[in-house]
Regions:
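Conserved Class I SAM-dependent methyltransferase catalytic core
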Residues: 14, 21, 27-43, 214, ...
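Non-catalytic, mostly N-terminal accessory regions of nucleic-acid modification and defense proteins
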Residues: 1-223, 283-289, 396-399, 428-429, ...
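Hydrophobic alpha-helix feature that most strongly marks membrane-spanning transmembrane helices
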Residues: 246, 273, 277, 315, ...
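Conserved S-adenosyl-L-methionine
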Residues: 200-312, 317-327, 332-338, 348, ...
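Conserved nucleotide-binding/hydrolysis micro-motifs of P-loop NTPases
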Residues: 41, 262-263, 290-291, 315-318, ...
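Short secondary-structure junction motifs
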Residues: 29, 250-252, 279-281, 360, ...
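Flexible, glycine-/basic-rich loop-and-beta segments that form/coincide
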Residues: 403-481, 485-498
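Hydrophobic alpha-helical scaffolding
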Residues: 154, 175, 231, 257-261, ...
Length: 859
């Protein structure tokens, strides 16, 4: 049967769908506190019961039996049992306040909302006596169960909270945490709520792709045993850094953070704990970072704690940040000899982080571009930082990455151990993104390009530059990126002579370096010289075909196909063999690097495009599939199925029902395509016939609605009507049938009504055939899962994972060539109309108008 595991994508979808269904009209930022808070309480309850199970070695008991046993043990050995649970967990929850007891009360029809309030209050009381109560204190302070946003009366609020409680009821939070699925789901929900919250999201969330840039910058710079985020938000930056460390480093990592907003501070602690961070490994404080310098070294109270990594996405250009009247006597600012202006707190956050950075550490902070060029006190601070050799890199990111602001931002990287004379890496990544709805997003390839450029310190035209101290001094310590990296010029200037007399200027062919290097002779053969130095393309279509079939392209295409086949063969065997011991993150990283190397020897292709193809394969298929395979084995997982649940009805009749089964790994339509092709072809043929008939019927409906048409008088009365007697876009079959019976064959209208009747009848019959054949094919597919051979599984899974990869990567080879051919076509069109031809056209039009005027007769 195999082990049915809930995958990361499945739990994310389930929880987010549930959130949207349950929250009603409550705004995202409000509902987030309730959903994430109760989800965390379920985690605490599951951990409590899991500790009881481990302590008593009750591994075979169901959850209900375990709850009953816990109640008995707790009542019998109360103080002793509290100690047994609290010691390893840092807290305890009495049985009457467990999440499982809430569900029991719900199922038995005696749930009251007060039990949730009592449970949360009891948790606060019990942890107050802990040695380190800060770990859990006031975690649920944002959950106001009397808030009328939950419902205007107690019954409505109780009903809404019960629905939310039920959403998490069957999730084993302990098992999900061990596989990181729980933490990932929690982080996903935070991100989704952030997008829904819009501007308010800036208080607690850094977009995942921005977190990745900062995390990979610091993680690739050296060993990390401690990490600090002075504007910690939800804690996502700390956790993203963790994911890029070795397993051993993750276990030993110490987390530090400070957050001013209390609700967000609670979110941080929950997020860290759900990601498996032990309470003793995290120190998070609810306070104003700039007003209250923290943390201090407890053994040396007058010295700052320093960390291996500092990451931060602080509020941008925070006004009036210095309400406490801080001065240069504050050691965070004294070493640069200038106070950041009260009107913008950007450098205040930067200097705070730098003050707490260890001598061998790396800091990465997200800031608005103004810090790179603004003058006054900020200019003095920037000069001091450059002279002291602290700034290691400046990375310009695209605009509109954040939900709370559209301004472009940059990442400033700082170190205290840079070599003397080492240049500053300046990267302009502002043009590398993909637009998703209204937001811009960095893709995997964009992040990889940034990190490789930074770590390898590569200079790339229009992308990166290594700026020396002398060069920066010549620019008056201005680090504005366009001073060092010239933007890509895509616009080709217009040539006056070309417009006047026609022809593409010879120098414009220098802007087509790819086709002029790989197919220069082919291009020249398709050009005719209009006059000296100006050309036109004879036939752009045949030129494109010949260039794409040129010997160079064909050779590279064949070589690339061989590379792809080798790549696929290698990873096909690796992916089939994953197990619970496989580190999927490491496997993904190696596979992506190998994909990038596919184009290493082809100079005109961006090798990161192949990187993205494989990254999308992981996002869309491999991540989920490999989680399932790792819990079973390849061939066992491949024949596993699950109920296909669909929502039917609406309103009070809305319900969820099973509609057959679907494969856990192998999609049903793949089995149809490869193993039941005849049946599928038959269905496709039916569908094509149906589409044709419905098009024909649609044309009749249109003329039946048109009062001026010949068919109106015959067909209009046969259309369906709504309650207001307005015609619908459909015929009433009963009316058509009745009309046909009343007409005789000699009537003028008979053929038209008969045609309508025949169309409706044929559509009805084809729909029945489709329904019957669809049901029959579905049943064959359901049964076929159990009898799939290893060879069939190999065929199906290979096509799922790699069926389109040769074509997808092959397109990358041709894309730059096609782009230049499009430019050539545009240039040919641009200079096709000369001044002489335009004058001639005007003259001809004037003559035509003159002739028409002569024919006008005044009556």
């Amino acid at each position: 049967m195999g082990i049915h595991v809930i995958t990361s994508d499945e739990i994310k979808k389930r929880l987010w769908d549930g959130a949207n269904e349950l929250r009603g009209s409550m705004n995202a930022s409000q509902y987030m506190d309730y959903m994430l808070g109760l989800m965390f309480y379920k985690f605490l309850s599951d951990k409590t019961l899991d500790q009881v199970r481990a302590t008593e070695m009750l591994h075979d008991l169901t959850e209900a039996e375990l709850l009953e046993r816990y109640e008995k043990l707790y009542n019998e050995y109360q103080e002793k049992y509290i100690k047994l649970i609290r010691q390893p967990l840092g807290y305890y929850i009495p049985p009457e306040y467990l999440y499982q007891r809430w569900m029991k009360d719900i199922n038995e029809g005696r749930f009251e909302l007060q039990i949730v309030t009592d449970s949360l209050n009891n948790f606060e009381r019990t942890i107050a006596s802990n040695q380190n109560p800060d770990d859990f204190e006031n975690l649920f302070s944002s959950l106001d169960l009397t808030n009328q946003a939950l419902g205007k009366d107690l019954n409505t609020r109780s009903k809404n909270i019960k629905s939310l409680i039920a959403l998490f009821a069957d999730l084993n939070m302990v098992a999900l945490q061990k596989s990181d699925i729980l933490g990932d789901a929690y982080e996903y929900l935070i991100g989704m709520f952030a997008m829904e919250s819009g501007k308010k999201a800036g208080e607690f969330y850094t977009p995942r792709q921005v977190s990745e840039v900062l995390a990979q910058v610091v993680a690739t710079s050296g060993p990390i045993a401690s990490i600090y985020d002075p504007a910690v938000g939800s804690g996502s930056l700390l956790l993203t850094v963790k994911q890029h460390l070795s397993q051993q480093a993750q276990k030993e990592l110490m987390y530090y953070g400070q957050e001013k907003n209390t609700a967000t501070y609670n979110l941080t602690r929950m997020n860290l704990l759900l990601h498996g961070v032990r309470p003793e490994k995290m120190t998070v404080r609810n306070a104003d970072t700039l007003a209250q310098d923290w943390p201090e070294d407890p053994e040396r109270p007058n010295e700052a704690c320093q960390f291996d990594a500092v990451v931060m996405n602080p509020p941008y250009s925070l006004k009036n940040w210095n309400s406490e009247g801080l001065t240069l006597s504050d050691p965070r600012f004294s070493f640069v000899g200038a106070m950041p202006p009260d009107s913008a707190g950007d450098y205040a956050f930067l200097l705070h982080g730098l003050y707490h950075l260890g001598q061998q550490g790396t800091m990465a902070i997200v800031l608005p571009h103004g810090v790179l060029f603004r003058g006054g006190a900020e200019g003095a601070i920037r000069k001091r930082l450059i002279d002291k050799n602290y700034i290691d890199a400046v990375i310009g990111l695209p605009s509109n990455l954040f939900t709370n602001t559209g301004i472009p931002v940059c990442v400033v990287v700082l170190k205290k151990n840079r070599s003397l004379g080492e240049p500053i890496v300046i990267i302009d990544a502002s043009q590398y993104f993909v637009k998703v709805k209204t937001q811009n997003m960095l893709q995997d390839k964009d992040i990889a390009r940034i990190i490789e450029t930074y770590t390898s310190r590569i200079e790339t035209e229009s992308y990166s530059h290594l700026a020396s101290l002398g060069e920066i001094k010549r620019n008056d310590y201005n680090l504005n990126i366009p001073r060092y990296v010239e933007p890509i010029k895509t616009e080709i200037p217009h040539h006056v002579d070309g417009h006047l007399y026609g022809g593409i200027p010879k120098e414009d062919f220098n802007r087509l370096p790819i086709i002029m290097s790989i197919a220069q002779d082919i291009v020249k053969n398709h050009l005719s010289e209009v006059r000296e130095g100006f050309y036109k393309v004879k036939a752009i279509g045949s030129l494109q075909a010949e260039v794409l079939q040129s010997p160079t392209i064909e050779t590279e295409r064949k070589t690339l196909e061989d590379y792809i086949n080798t790549f696929v063969e290698k990873y096909w065997n690796i992916l089939k063999s994953v197990s619970s011991e496989t580190n999927l993150a490491d496997l993904k990283a190696v596979m992506l690097d190998d994909a990038k190397n596919l184009f290493a020897d082809i100079p005109w292709v961006d090798s990161y495009e192949a990187y993205q193809v494989v990254a999308e394969l992981w996002h869309q298929k491999l991540t989920t599939d490999l989680e399932i395979i790792a819990a079973n084995d390849f061939y066992t997982a491949a024949i596993m199925t699950e109920p296909h649940m669909v929502t039917k009805g609406s309103g009070k009749t809305k319900r969820v029902e099973q509609d057959g089964v679907i494969g856990r790994l192998i999609p049903n339509d793949l089995i149809e395509h490869f193993l039941f092709s005849e049946e599928r072809d038959k269905l496709d043929s039916y569908q094509a016939d149906l589409d044709s008939l419905e098009t024909e019927l649609g044309e009749l409906i249109e003329v039946a609605k048109e009062e001026t048409s010949d068919e109106y008088n015959t067909l209009n009365d046969l259309l369906k009507r709504d309650d207001n007697d307005e015609v619908k876009d459909a015929f009433d079959a009963a009316h058509v049938n009745k009309a046909l019976k009343e007409l005789v064959k000699t009537d003028e209208s008979f053929e038209l009504v008969k045609k309508t009747y025949d169309l409706l009848d044929r559509i009805k019959k084809i729909n029945k055939s489709i329904k019957d054949d669809r049901k029959s094919l579905d049943e064959k597919v359901y049964a076929r899962f159990e009898t799939l051979t290893h060879e069939e599984i190999d065929q199906l899974m290979w096509n799922k994972w790699f069926g389109t990869i040769t074509n997808d990567i092959g397109k990358i080879l041709e894309a730059p060539v096609l782009k230049e051919l499009d430019i050539l076509s545009m240039l040919n069109e641009r200079y096709s109309d000369t001044l002489q031809s335009i004058d001639l056209e005007i003259s001809n039009l004037e003559k035509s108008l003159e002739e028409m005027m002569k024919e006008l007769v005044l009556e």
